[in-house]
Amino acid sequence: MARLAAFDMDGTLLMPDHHLGRETIATLSRLRERDITLTFATGRHVLEMRHILGTLSLDAYLITGNGTRIHSLEGDVLHRQDLDPQVADTVMHHAWDTRASMHVFNDNGWFTGQEIPALLQAHVYSGFRYQVIDIKSIPAHQVTKICFCGDHDDLIRLRIQLNEALEERAHLCFSAVDCLEVLPLGCNKGSALAVLSNHLGLSLADCMAFGDAMNDREMLGSVGRGLIMGNAMPQLIAALPHLSVIGHCGNQAVSHFLTHWLDNPHLPYSPE
């Protein structure tokens, strides 16, 4: 039986309205009763995740910023990784040929250059929001990650530009169809989970994980049991064809799967 369960948030544990369902919360409590360690592995900021965690009355480790930070149950930093300052400086100051909006993250919060109210819809559960600022004024040595939000085809073209400019100095991935992330080289949820599992005296084979986007690829592919959401990006399913696909986040599929796993571990699972 797995000893640690790692969960992506958006498109996985959260429903389409960006809330946690009652069944999901109850199932997470059941996992803790079985002494299974919980880990939320997300692109969201730790400041937001601490608020969400505080509403659940659950102990969980936090992998945030797509692996740039790991926090203990007590809130202590176990691991940190920032963007190379030269990479951050290039991304923030270059005039990219794109209509996508740029968003910069550091330990103090989420920063962008203009009001984009539509982006706040994903944060209604926590009330977390961006701060509008001149992005070029942000110190490059304090940046954890940078992301661009916009049309997918536009982001694909932007990724080509970023790859040419940054070469092998950063890790680029889609955390959603409409979100392209620039992360520290070698930084992803999978590498962060490896650090955390080692800290806990576990192996990745002792872990199970759930996800729906390309920023979950390394995590899902490295654990003992990786589960892909039915609403996942097609690219993720294609990249990990050997992994099982469960149901849709709107049906609280993670809870559905885990309830079966807890109650009938030796029987085959069907998402129906």
Swiss-Prot record:
Q: Which cofactors are named for this entry? A: Mg(2+)
Q: What EC class is this?
A: hydrolase
What gene name is listed for this protein?
A: cof
The catalysed reaction is: 4-amino-2-methyl-5-(diphosphooxymethyl)pyrimidine + H2O = 4-amino-2-methyl-5-(phosphooxymethyl)pyrimidine + phosphate + H(+)
- This entry's Enzyme Commission designation comes to 3.6.1.-
Question: Which family would the database say this protein is a member of?
Answer: Belongs to the HAD-like hydrolase superfamily. Cof family.
Keyword Metal-binding listed? The answer is yes
What organism, scientifically named, is this protein from? Salmonella typhi
Tell me which UniProt keywords the record has, alphabetically. Answer: Hydrolase, Magnesium, Metal-binding
Pfam families reported in the protein's UniProt record: Hydrolase_3
Q: What span is annotated as the signal peptide, if there is one?
A: none
Q: Name one GO molecular function term.
A: 4-amino-5-hydroxymethyl-2-methylpyrimidine diphosphatase activity
> What are the positions of the active site?
D8
Q: What is this protein called?
A: HMP-PP phosphatase
> Any idea which positions bind Mg(2+)?
D8, D10, D212
Functionally, this protein is described as follows:
Catalyzes the hydrolysis of 4-amino-2-methyl-5-hydroxymethylpyrimidine pyrophosphate (HMP-PP) to 4-amino-2-methyl-5-hydroxymethylpyrimidine phosphate (HMP-P).
